[in-house]
């Protein structure tokens, strides 16, 4: 996505660099016997904050796991958030987020990976008690775009999928040691 000051590119070719450098397909699927990971685009040149989910993206979520192994952990990857994280109250959500979250639940998604906020946070989130999806927000890994306490702090999440558990380890970069170090661990039943 081009920055707001490159208005023409942002409005008329917002994902040109992404498609050229990373991937043409804006809704890729990667799967094996244990995991099915579906990406859905929430970034559009006409939105300034929060992104959006249209009926087209909802259909990608609904049908994106067709053919996935029955026991495979279903993971949805989006840039913008689909649910508010209590610890980060007041942050932007994608337009159409609630419907997208419901659609993800109906599709059997158990883990949503997202970014946008440049803050590391992992928590189960549900629209109703007992129906939660784990939301893992990644901090910034390769820039200084963090916010608040995460400003200029680099993070990433290491995810391990086991037969009965999902393990997410948050790692933070220690510049004085030139390495990433685990700072928090989360384990969830599948």
Name what the model sees in each region.
Residues 1, 79, 116-118:
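Histidine-centered divalent metal-coordination motifs
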Residues 1-63, 68, 102-103, 129, ...:
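Extended active-site neighborhood of metal-dependent phosphoesterases/phosphodiesterases
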Residues 2-5, 46-48, 83-86, 121-123, ...:
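Short catalytic/ligand-binding loop motif for oxyanion handling, primarily in non-cytosolic enzymes
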Residues 6-8, 48-53, 87-92, 146-150:
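Short, solvent-exposed loop/turn segments at secondary-structure boundaries
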Residues 34-44, 75-79, 133-140:
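Active-site-proximal beta-strand elements of phosphoester/diester hydrolases
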Residues 70-85:
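Short acidic, glycine-rich surface-loop motifs adjacent to enzyme active sites
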Residues 89-163:
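Conserved beta-sheet core of the metallophosphoesterase superfamily
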Residues 160-190:
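A short C-terminal boundary segment appended to hydrolase-like catalytic domains
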